[in-house]
């Protein structure tokens, strides 16, 4: 099964830039979207179905035009779960899961820490998400968590680790959390197969030349639970897709 994760930074904006044509060409079995910034009634749902995705699930934020996640799939899931059931985690539409016979796929949009208030919210979300996943793994050991984690794990994952050492997204406490999350039973599928530097998934629009000069951050991941480790066939970053300030990431599970 080929799975793609993509923070589209506004699905309507991405559609206007050719997203649906790209989706047909990329042809994943499942695509996890983050930061959709829209509700399903605002979207051309028939176009997604005509593109080959009859099953599409949308979890927008309560606040209009903000956050939100979605999953589109060619294969009908046996179960769909919107959110975690924890109010402070769910009102911004940050977590959606589909269950298939063999494993489950989750679309995750971890909060960013743009100011002290949001950083506190981010750390609370991270702690509660870890606890949620610890319990979920007892029920669903085969789990793929795709999304925008808003964290660079290692120095190799960011273009300027020294200058960004005190910036949210690369703070020691954030990196420690991701390190512990991985050690608790997950594989960073891209790093499992690729140890090369210069592979990023997000480039700030505040610096217009950042993407052209590849001054980026790798904050989008497809994390695969340990029982699926030997079934990771491919893991790629797809920087040629330019519908967003992020690019898609891909994992293929046998």
Feature roles, as predicted:
Residues 51-55, 127-215, 219:
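Metal-dependent phosphoesterases centered on the DNase I-like endonuclease/exonuclease/phosphatase
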Residues 74, 98-101, 225-226, 251-254:
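Active-site beta-strand termini and strand-to-loop segments that position acidic
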Residues 37-39, 45-113:
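Structured beta-strand-rich core segments of catalytic domains in phosphoester-bond hydrolases
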